[in-house]
Amino acid sequence: MTTTATTHEKTTFFATYDWAKSWQDLPWSHEAPTIFLAEICERRKPGRALDIGCGAGTDSVYLAKKGWEVTSLDFMPKALEYTQERARQAGVTVRPVEADIAEWVVPEPFDLVLDHGLLHNMDPVRHPAYRQRVLSAVADDGDFVLLHWHPRYPGQPSGRMGPTRTGREDILGFFAPELQERFFAREEFEDLPDLVGGGMTQAYYWLRRNRAHSHPAELVEQVRATFRRNNIDVDAALAKAGDAPVKPKLAATDLLARLVGPGRLGLSHKPLSPGDADALVRDWAERAALGPRAVANLFTLFTAQDHGDLCGAVPKCGQCDVRICKRQRYR
């Protein structure tokens, strides 16, 4: 696994910081905090935050002013100078760390991890090391915010300076199955210099731990608890089916695929065809030693009209105890 920054990376960043007369001159400088940070600050109490590639320091200072204990990490000394100076001017403090994220030893989990455009500037051979560090840094109930450029059309060049453009499905696949998308936003920039490949879509990801991956038994129990809450005896139907697939009354053939896809339980980070859903659930359950056929049947009955229609075409979220579900993100 390659971890050391390449000559191209170092040359590009050192040249840019040597050229800049102030933090405002940096091509990646921004006045407003990265999208999603304000909402995160409203939703949760301040904790430990890690700003990977802090750059001009805008996000580090914003979070520190909101009461967060901020670690500002960058391998460029001048980036840390800008960040600390802006923190002093704002009357707050941050913890500067001069290090390369791909080589840094993560000291503790963080409640919030932020990357405002570092990943898309890294050499792809270092991506596995980056991924490993991010997964180590995000706490079990933590949030990860990522800014990354997307191509505006298939095959769009990245330009001599980059950044590298990567589509949404590839980004989600890169962090799957450990992390899953909570929210997504995008901005369109139709015309930029050829040096950076012209226009781009600037994408923002708010990711969290995928508890269907890390806590599979908890998910199964939450489904069972929902049946109990609604006074539905699901065990009789499971016992009757045994090792055979159940055949309940369904409103649509794709309901199991919708249930376990990215819009609900998140067993898969991409949409599934109806024919693939049963096998995916059984594989997932087998890896978790949960009884593949029984779990697949349980999830199928969860979508069935004749077993409460709990998570069918119109899910009854108000009657549901499944917290490991994307539809519950506002609840």
Predicted regions span which residues?
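Class I (Rossmann-like) S-adenosyl-L-methionine-dependent methyltransferase catalytic domain
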Residues: 2-44, 48-50, 56-108, 122-133, ...
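A conserved beta-strand element that flanks and buttresses the S-adenosyl-L-methionine
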Residues: 114
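Short catalytic micro-motifs in class I SAM-dependent methyltransferases
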Residues: 117-121
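C-terminal accessory module of base-excision DNA glycosylases/AP lyases that mediates lesion recognition
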Residues: 202, 214-331
